[in-house]
Amino acid sequence: MGEARVESQLAYAGAVSDEPTIRPAYDGSSVAFRALEAWGWGELVNLGYYPLAALPQLVFGMAPFQRRLVERALELLAPAPGERVIDAACGRGGTTSRIARSGAFALGLDLLPENVAEAEARASDEPRPRFAVADVTRLPASAGGIDLDAESFDAVLCLEAGFHFGPKGRRAFLEESWRMLRPGGRLVLVDFVWRDARPERIESLDPDRFVRDTWRFSEFEPLERYRATAREIGFAERAFRDWTRPVIDRFQHIATALARTGDTRAGRALLCALRPGLARIRPDEWRDLVALMRAHGEVRRASRYVAFRLEKPA
């Protein structure tokens, strides 16, 4: 793969190019997204957090597990009444609405206008978050009528989106978060990271680009490079959580089992009885899902899923 092809997959305009390419990951054109949506992706679009004792709840879909992941991220963020909080790459706005219910002013920013429109449609009237289209790696002076002045926010959350930004975009996002935060403010960053210092190894682990082309990213940030960049910008790391096992490890096992079940006639009938939306997936697409989950497994073994709480010193 040439460097130009890799960079063409980067999702955010501020990172490399002027044309965002993230849309195909979330517009229903991939069978992976359609399967996840049928199994419960809705206002929240994250992998979920899977305690062993709660796994029987999977028959009701992914939503309870997605809420658990948001709850853990918000425990780290700890939004308080009267604070101003940015939900960066907010997707359909479910997390932003939860921040608003804490009494904080919540502003959800997303690159895709269709996500912002859906977030606004889903949001309750009271307390109502605000949403706007913006590239969080290159923030404008204002968004949705809200001024984005330096040091005008108390907290920033980025939940399971940084992997889309590309290496340059991740650094730019950290710099933008630093600029937006007041002294003493905090950034909670939840993301996939690469276990070692050689993220280019994904080329050999995902040689057909099944994983990268499905989810529109080039590579995961090495854990220590994330930390080094944050320190260089000025952040102090106040908390770290490794959620690899309850998030990506268990999700991998669950999704692989579902894909293999759907790849048989009897299995498809069972799954469609549980989640009728799965009937829209053709038999050949179930085979594609099996291949995709096999590729995911290779990438997962070289990855971790972590959360940071970074603070801008007062």
Where are the regions a protein language model picked out?
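N-terminal, positively charged/glycine-rich alpha-helical extensions of SAM-dependent methyltransferases
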Residues: R5-A53
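Conserved alpha-helix/loop element of class I SAM-dependent methyltransferases that forms part
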Residues: A63-P81
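Class I SAM-dependent methyltransferase SAM/SAH-binding core
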Residues: I86, R92-L139
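A short acidic, Gly/Pro-enriched loop at the edge of an enzyme's catalytic core
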Residues: A141-V156
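A short glycine-rich, Lys/Arg-flanked "PGG" loop and its adjoining helix->strand segment in the class I
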Residues: R171-R186
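Short, glycine-/aromatic-enriched active-site segment of Class I SAM-dependent methyltransferases
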Residues: F192-F217
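Substrate-binding/catalytic lobe of Class I Rossmann-like enzymes that use SAM or dcSAM, i.e.
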Residues: V211-P276, R287-A295
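C-terminal lobe and adjacent flexible extensions of AdoMet/dcAdoMet transferase-like proteins
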Residues: G277-A314
